[in-house]
Structure formats: structure tokens, C-alpha cells
Amino acid sequence: MRVSKYLLSTQKETPANAEVISHQLMLRAGMIRRNASGLYSYLPTGLRVLRKVEAIVREEMNKAGAIEILMPMVQPADLWVETGRWDKFGPELLRFKDRHNRDFVLGPTHEEVITDLIRKEVSSYKQLPLNLYQIQTKFRDEVRPRFGVMRSREFLMKDAYSFHLDVDTMNETYEAMYQAYSNILSRMGLAFRPVLADTGSIGGSMSHEFHVLAQSGEDLIAYSTGSDYAANIEKAESPMPTEARGAATEELRLVDTPNAKTIAELVEQFGLDITKTVKTLIVKGATEEAPLVALIVRGDHELNEIKADKLDLVASPLEFAPEALIRDAIGAGPGSLGPVGLNMPIIIDHSVSVMSDFAAGANQDDKHYFGINWERDLPLAQAADIRNVVEGEPTPDGLGTYAMARGIEVGHIFQLGTNYSKSMNATVLDENGKSQVLLMGCYGVGVSRIVAAAIEQNFDDRGIVWPEAIAPFSVGILPMNMHKSHRVTDIAEQLYKDLSAAGIDVLLDDRKERPGVMFADMELIGIPHTVVIGDRNIDAGVFEYKNRRTGEKQDVPFDQIVDFLKNLQA
């Protein structure tokens, strides 16, 4: 490709409304342009990267035995009503009526459509197992699209769905998809971690997320320092206390705390050990008999809302009680709540169950109890794992301690079981002629999100530093003063032809531009390898090669340059 016949569209200045580095660099490098909130057009450079990501995804899915299909982006609402997600999904599901007043949605995912397809096309166990995938545009009407294509409303996704009659083949396909996703990210040269994850709105039993590691990642990953164990912070298991509860050494006493509205203020004003305090959070209950439930964690711990949402007594989705409701039920507001004398179900974190002589709100405004002890001042409450893990704690496998990293979720695999097939009556006849509900798996990769995640992991102060496999071009040719030197023009043109003939993606900057502008553009768009041609190089019979990632420069003889560059890509 020649720059003179290409839409390069680079920008010197960082756009003011671009929050994260990938959004900034995708705009500056001329990869995308915003059409509306969360909607982007891909310019040639961006599309080249997107297509390379897509190609790797497709190759690995095919290797894993999945079969490509294509389903419509527009889906009939009847299917969503059938599974119950028409009411459950919320405003992210964009709904509309056609000219005949029939309800439709823009698909954020395709479980309903694929299940409907399979129940009509597959009738016998002999046709199973089956794993079908597509690479298709999705739409989620995000309340606040941000970070460019990282969290846009319209995005490109690979979604696969597998169908089984038995758990063994479902597990086999799950493992095959796990390996395929690992292969995809490895081939792209990205540092990543597969982590145990919550199944979220899709549902199901087993779930893993695949995260590209980046300091800007929205997700916190808890991983073991001594094994491969890793989990999203929402899913990471807190260790059970190994120590016994200490004996009571303090009397229960009521203390005035007018200026202590938070745990931090309480600790600072009264010189308390934060591990001797608890936080009491009131949420809505799941039953009429218990409309409110108290959740209690240690003062230095954070409530894990995903874990709390799964408690039988807690209404789902989790909803914190408003202050007016709390005051009406307890007589005090947030900041003064605690377990002593509380007339509602109480669920404490396991770490709270071994506490003694601790402080908590007294359920009176501006008052706390100090010296609280279980089984003396109140019955020991029901305990569960309801908190986030903390760095340094032992991991569940016993092979290390927790460390933390930030990641960007780019893939998610689920074992759905019969979540969708049962509600949609997707069945086949088994070998005995008996009707069986299909087991399902679901496997998604954010194709367009990978592009942004790769940039978040690979950039410097000059621009993007693409991994070789997904760079828009592999080699950039920079002829110095090409339009003033016939020798430079001839050598540059010949090199361009030779590299193109060798199957190398090459960009020849044949513009009448200053060398500084040409170098800056090549570095901004992140081309891994550049070859500089000038009269001095020609006199010496060498090209000047520069590696974008390392900055290394070296002279390469004319007759060796093609093999040299091909070897770098091997």
C-alpha cells in the first residue's frame, strides 16, 4: 500500500474527549472516527487490524472443530419472551417495532436465536455434539458508552454455542474452547490470564473470563503466586479463618461518636484497630417475612456484591435499602448500624465470625458499641463468604497467596446447561428414542474489544506498538527525499515490489513530506519494522532497519533485506 493512495488520517493532538490511551491512539492513528455516542466507523488502518484479529479468531475456532454460521442482528421479540429475558435484560436491550407493529430487538447476544435454530434443525442424538459460531455485530444500549471501542454500543463479537446430550461432551467442548481462546491470545502476542468468573446475566454453572493484562483494566483479577489459579475479584474465594475466636476481654459499652460517620473516622478518632471494627450494610430481602437483611463485613474488607446477590435471603438483583427505609425499620441511619439488637436476618462474613471485642454501630444515631462479643452480647449469626479477597491471603488451592492485577475482559466461556434449551423446549431423541433436553455451552470473544485491549498493553509515548500478528502493516518503507532523488525512488519502488511479492504487508510512504512527519506517523500507527532509504544508505549498499518495539537500529545489505524481514515474522 502506498500512503499517497491511502487514507492515513493521523492527528498530532490528543482529542479532549478521549479518556483512555487506546481511545486516544485509535483516534490519533486514524483507526476510528466517532459517529454518535458509542458508535464508530473504522477507517482503513483500524479495519486492517480488526480483520487480522478476526482471521486469527476464525482460524482457531475452525481448528477446534467449530462450524461457522451467520445469524441476523435483528431478532424477533417472541424468542426473548420465551426465555424470560424480554423482561429481565433491562434497557440495554434495544427494542423496536417494524411497520407491521411487531416487536424486535437488536441482538446483544444470540442464545435465543441459536436455540430456536437448533430445535428446528436437530432432532437426533446422532447429530450431536455440535458447536456453531459466528462473527457478527452486536448492539447493547449502554447507559454511558465510554473508552472508545472498549465499551461501545455497537461492537463486533465472535459468539459460539455448543449443544450436547451428556456432560462429558459438554466438558470436552468447554476445554477445547478454553484452549482455543488461549491460542488466540497467544498468537496475538498478548499477555493474558484466564480467570474463574461469575456467569452474570447469561447464567449457567461453569464460567471463565479471558483478560488481557493492562494497568487501565476495569476488572481486578486475583491470582495465585504459586499456581495457575486466577479468578475475577467477584468470584475469588476468601479463605476460611484458621484461628479460633478470641476470648472476650472487654465489657460491652455504649460510646458517643457524633463525628464518626465512617469506619475511617471511627478508627482515627478513637484509635481503634480497623480489624476490630465491622461495617453493616442493609439490603432488600427476598421474602415478605424478611424484607430487609443485614450484611456485615470486617472494617477493612469490602462487600462482594456478586457473592451477596447469590444468598437465599437476599433479593436478586442485589439492592441496597434507601436511608428512609432503614430509618423506618431501625431508627438510625447508615454510619450508626450494627448487629446488636438488630431485628432482621443477619449474615456475616466468615472473617467476622472469629472476631472478639469489636466495635459496631449501636443502631442509634451518633453512637457505637465497643467491646462486642459473639454469644455473649448477641447470638452468632449465619456466616458466608461475602467479601472481596485481599492481597497476601492464601488461595483456595493452598499453593500460594493472592496477588492482584488489572485486566480487560476480551473473552468469556460458559457452561449454560439447560438454561435456554429447557425454556425453549429444545430437545432431541436419544438412542433409546426418549426425548432429552439439550445441554448448552456459550463462548464469546470481543473481536473489536481485543483491538483496544492490545493497544492498552502495547504503547509508548510515541504511539502504538503493535504485536506482529495484528499490526496493520508489518513493514514501513521511509524513502528520504524520494521526490528529489531518482536513486531513492528506484530503490524504494523495487523494495516495495520485492516485499509485496514475498507476501509481506508493507506501507510505502511516498508523500512529499518532511522526514520528521513520516517517522512520527510510522511510530504513531505502530508498524513493527521500518526501513529507511537515503542517498547515504545507497552509497553504502545498505538499508537502515529500525525495530518499533525495541528501538534497535541496524544496517542490512540490499540483497539480504527481504530474507531479514521474513525471518523477523517467522
From Swiss-Prot:
Catalytic activity: tRNA(Pro) + L-proline + ATP = L-prolyl-tRNA(Pro) + AMP + diphosphate
InterPro entries: aa-tRNA-synt_IIb, aa-tRNA-synth_II, aa-tRNA-synth_II/BPL/LPL, Anticodon-bd, Anticodon-bd_dom_sf, Pro-tRNA-ligase_IIa, Pro-tRNA-synth_IIa_bac-type, Pro-tRNA-Synthase_IIa_type1
One GO CC annotation: cytosol
Cytoplasm recorded as keyword: yes
Compartment(s) of residence: Cytoplasm
Annotated keywords: Aminoacyl-tRNA synthetase, ATP-binding, Cytoplasm, Ligase, Nucleotide-binding, Protein biosynthesis
EC top class, as a word: ligase
GO biological process: prolyl-tRNA aminoacylation
EC number(s) on file: 6.1.1.15
Quaternary context: Homodimer.
Domain comment, as recorded: Consists of three domains: the N-terminal catalytic domain, the editing domain and the C-terminal anticodon-binding domain.
Protein task: Catalyzes the attachment of proline to tRNA(Pro) in a two-step reaction: proline is first activated by ATP to form Pro-AMP and then transferred to the acceptor end of tRNA(Pro). As ProRS can inadvertently accommodate and process non-cognate amino acids such as alanine and cysteine, to avoid such errors it has two additional distinct editing activities against alanine. One activity is designated as 'pretransfer' editing and involves the tRNA(Pro)-independent hydrolysis of activated Ala-AMP.
HAMAP family (UniProt xref): Pro_tRNA_synth_type1
The name this protein goes by in its record: Proline--tRNA ligase
Gene: proS
